[in-house]
Amino acid sequence: MSWNKTLLLSTALFIFSGAACAEKIACPNTLQNALTTHRLNDASLFQGPPEKHGELMPDNDSHIVWTLQEYQDYGKKMGLPLWLVCRYENTSKTVELKVPDSANQCKAGLEDNSTLFYAFCE
Protein backbone atom coordinates (compact mmCIF):
# COMPACT_ATOMS: atom_id res chain seq x y z
CA MET A 1 0.00 0.00 0.00
CA SER A 2 1.43 3.38 -0.92
CA TRP A 3 2.19 6.04 1.68
CA ASN A 4 -0.76 8.23 0.54
CA LYS A 5 -3.26 5.37 0.79
CA THR A 6 -1.95 4.44 4.25
CA LEU A 7 -2.27 8.04 5.41
CA LEU A 8 -5.79 8.32 3.97
CA LEU A 9 -6.89 5.08 5.62
CA SER A 10 -5.37 6.08 8.98
CA THR A 11 -7.06 9.47 8.85
CA ALA A 12 -10.45 7.94 8.00
CA LEU A 13 -10.17 5.44 10.86
CA PHE A 14 -9.26 8.22 13.28
CA ILE A 15 -12.20 10.40 12.22
CA PHE A 16 -14.80 7.62 12.30
CA SER A 17 -13.59 6.13 15.59
CA GLY A 18 -14.13 9.52 17.27
CA ALA A 19 -17.61 9.87 15.80
CA ALA A 20 -18.82 6.74 17.57
CA CYS A 21 -18.12 7.99 21.09
CA ALA A 22 -19.17 11.24 22.71
CA GLU A 23 -16.43 13.70 23.52
CA LYS A 24 -16.20 14.64 27.21
CA ILE A 25 -15.31 18.03 28.62
CA ALA A 26 -14.77 18.82 32.29
CA CYS A 27 -14.12 21.92 34.35
CA PRO A 28 -10.56 22.08 35.69
CA ASN A 29 -10.54 21.38 39.44
CA THR A 30 -8.48 24.49 40.11
CA LEU A 31 -7.70 27.84 38.52
CA GLN A 32 -4.30 29.43 39.04
CA ASN A 33 -4.31 33.22 39.37
CA ALA A 34 -0.95 34.86 40.15
CA LEU A 35 0.13 33.17 43.39
CA THR A 36 -3.30 31.87 44.40
CA THR A 37 -5.02 28.62 43.51
CA HIS A 38 -8.81 28.76 43.36
CA ARG A 39 -10.99 25.64 43.72
CA LEU A 40 -13.93 24.89 41.45
CA ASN A 41 -17.16 25.62 43.34
CA ASP A 42 -19.95 26.18 40.78
CA ALA A 43 -20.90 25.64 37.15
CA SER A 44 -23.66 26.77 34.80
CA LEU A 45 -24.83 25.78 31.34
CA PHE A 46 -25.60 28.43 28.72
CA GLN A 47 -27.39 28.35 25.36
CA GLY A 48 -25.23 30.61 23.23
CA PRO A 49 -22.38 32.84 24.40
CA PRO A 50 -22.39 33.22 28.22
CA GLU A 51 -22.15 37.01 27.95
CA LYS A 52 -25.66 36.96 26.40
CA HIS A 53 -27.01 35.52 29.71
CA GLY A 54 -28.90 32.52 28.27
CA GLU A 55 -28.40 30.41 31.39
CA LEU A 56 -30.28 27.09 31.44
CA MET A 57 -31.92 25.59 34.51
CA PRO A 58 -31.02 22.02 35.53
CA ASP A 59 -33.59 19.28 34.91
CA ASN A 60 -34.73 19.27 38.56
CA ASP A 61 -34.03 20.78 41.99
CA SER A 62 -32.40 17.74 43.60
CA HIS A 63 -29.46 17.20 41.21
CA ILE A 64 -27.50 19.48 38.91
CA VAL A 65 -28.09 17.62 35.65
CA TRP A 66 -28.94 18.93 32.20
CA THR A 67 -30.32 16.58 29.53
CA LEU A 68 -29.09 18.13 26.29
CA GLN A 69 -30.96 16.69 23.29
CA GLU A 70 -33.54 19.48 22.91
CA TYR A 71 -30.97 22.19 23.67
CA GLN A 72 -28.55 20.69 21.15
CA ASP A 73 -31.27 20.51 18.45
CA TYR A 74 -32.31 24.12 19.08
CA GLY A 75 -28.70 25.27 19.16
CA LYS A 76 -27.97 23.71 15.77
CA LYS A 77 -31.01 25.41 14.20
CA MET A 78 -30.34 28.81 15.75
CA GLY A 79 -26.53 28.84 15.75
CA LEU A 80 -26.41 28.88 19.56
CA PRO A 81 -24.05 26.20 20.86
CA LEU A 82 -23.99 25.19 24.51
CA TRP A 83 -21.31 26.47 26.90
CA LEU A 84 -20.30 25.11 30.30
CA VAL A 85 -19.08 27.93 32.54
CA CYS A 86 -16.84 26.93 35.45
CA ARG A 87 -16.68 29.22 38.50
CA TYR A 88 -14.05 29.27 41.23
CA GLU A 89 -13.79 30.35 44.89
CA ASN A 90 -12.65 33.90 45.64
CA THR A 91 -12.29 35.07 42.03
CA SER A 92 -14.51 36.43 39.29
CA LYS A 93 -12.45 34.62 36.64
CA THR A 94 -14.21 31.73 34.91
CA VAL A 95 -13.41 28.99 32.44
CA GLU A 96 -15.81 28.71 29.48
CA LEU A 97 -15.94 25.38 27.65
CA LYS A 98 -17.89 24.79 24.44
CA VAL A 99 -20.03 21.68 24.89
CA PRO A 100 -19.41 19.15 22.09
CA ASP A 101 -22.32 18.56 19.70
CA SER A 102 -22.10 14.86 20.58
CA ALA A 103 -22.73 15.45 24.31
CA ASN A 104 -26.00 14.10 25.74
CA GLN A 105 -25.79 15.29 29.34
CA CYS A 106 -23.99 17.68 31.67
CA LYS A 107 -23.63 17.14 35.42
CA ALA A 108 -22.25 19.14 38.33
CA GLY A 109 -22.10 18.74 42.09
CA LEU A 110 -20.07 17.47 45.00
CA GLU A 111 -18.29 14.15 44.71
CA ASP A 112 -19.57 11.46 47.10
CA ASN A 113 -18.19 11.87 50.64
CA SER A 114 -16.11 14.84 49.52
CA THR A 115 -15.96 18.61 49.38
CA LEU A 116 -14.62 18.51 45.80
CA PHE A 117 -16.97 20.01 43.22
CA TYR A 118 -17.10 18.60 39.69
CA ALA A 119 -18.73 19.63 36.42
CA PHE A 120 -18.61 17.84 33.08
CA CYS A 121 -20.51 17.16 29.87
CA GLU A 122 -20.45 13.95 27.85
Where are these regions (language model features)?
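Intrinsic low-complexity, intrinsically disordered segments enriched in polar/basic residues
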Residues: 1, 20-21
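Bacterial N-terminal signal peptides that target proteins for export
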Residues: 1-8
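N-terminal signal peptide c-region/cleavage motif recognized by signal peptidases
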Residues: 15-19
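Mitochondrial intermembrane space
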Residues: 21-122
